[in-house]
Amino acid sequence: MRLSTLTLLLLLPLAGCGYHTVGSATHIPGNVRTLAVPIFVTRAQAFHTEMAFTQATIRELNTRTKYRILNTASPDADATLNGTILSQTVAPLTYDATSGQSSSYLVTITAKALLTAHDGHTLYRNDAIIFHEQYQSTQDLNGFIQEDTAAINRVARDFAQALVSDMLEAF
């Protein structure tokens, strides 16, 4: 009797801890089968960021979910995921003392996401998603590679992973 009481007392706190199995705490109702993901809107003065974020999000949804993903707004979709790039900043992070120029930069992107059902009901909303990525610059013009594009792609991948996880797992 003592052992069963002790076991019960030890297991009781676990019942209310919020633990759940994968996919059981989703913001997305079970009747949603098709998600539309139109190209994200951008309010930033940056080239191609909205495309990188849209493509990364579609790739992540295709990889991690069973939903049929449409890459455009469609009345046939059960829900639509709209994203907006709110800002994109690039700031010098480190300086090269010999050249007097920046040797690495920090790119910061702020975005928001809104998932709405076909009837207009909000299923998921996050108005402040912030991601940072560092990249190196070079003063060698012969070997110059535009590193900021690679940094944006890494930020987009991290953003998509976090967004899909938040939508699916409610963490």
Segment roles from a protein language model:
Residues C17-K66, D119, Q139-L141, Q161, ...:
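A structural "domain/chain start" motif
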Residues I28-P29, T72-A77:
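Short, glycine-/polar-rich solvent-exposed loops and beta-turns at beta-strand/coil boundaries
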Residues R33, P38, L70, L81-N82, ...:
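A short, local hydrophobic-aromatic micro-motif
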Residues A44-Q55, S102-L106, Q146-D158:
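Soluble non-cytosolic domains of exported or imported proteins
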Residues T65-Y67, P75-N126, E133-A150:
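Surface-exposed short loop/turn segments
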